[in-house]
Amino acid sequence: MGTFVYDKPANAFEVDDRTLAHLRIVVMNKLRRSEPFMLELTMRDGSGHRSFWIHQGVPMQFRIFNAAHVRINRLWIETLMDAASGPNGLFVVPEPDEHENPQPSLLK
């Protein structure tokens, strides 16, 4: 289980390592382009959602405990990037099977 820390430790949010590794790539790419966006994460206990305004001026940490074992699914990255660029911001969508829906990669 990884941790996303937004601004300060009091704003820590647990996210599974695989999902967090993919979110990290999306956040990194969006901020590299100076494109702030809303990130919505579901509470693990099912009690609702938390929304974070992702912007270059806010310090963030991504603590991924098993990063060496996470294989990146480029199709999932592309799907998450599309969501982050949409009107509702970035929310975690189910991971697509790379082999069922092969598409040309948009990431270079």
Which residues does each PLM region occupy?
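Sterically constrained small-residue positions within well-ordered secondary structures
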Residues: 6, 30-32, 43
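Short secondary-structure junctions and interdomain/linker hinges
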Residues: 30, 34-38, 87, 91
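Intrinsically disordered, low-complexity boundary segments flanking structured domains
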Residues: 1, 24-28, 39-40
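Charged, amphipathic alpha-helical segments
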Residues: 17-31
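Short, extreme N-terminal segment that most often corresponds to the first beta-strand
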Residues: 1-16
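Mixed-charge, glycine-accented linear interaction segment located at domain edges/termini
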Residues: 67-108
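Short, structured protein-protein interaction patches enriched in aromatics and acidic/basic residues
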Residues: 35-69
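Histidine- and/or cysteine-centered catalytic micro-motif in compact active-site loops
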Residues: 9, 18, 42-44
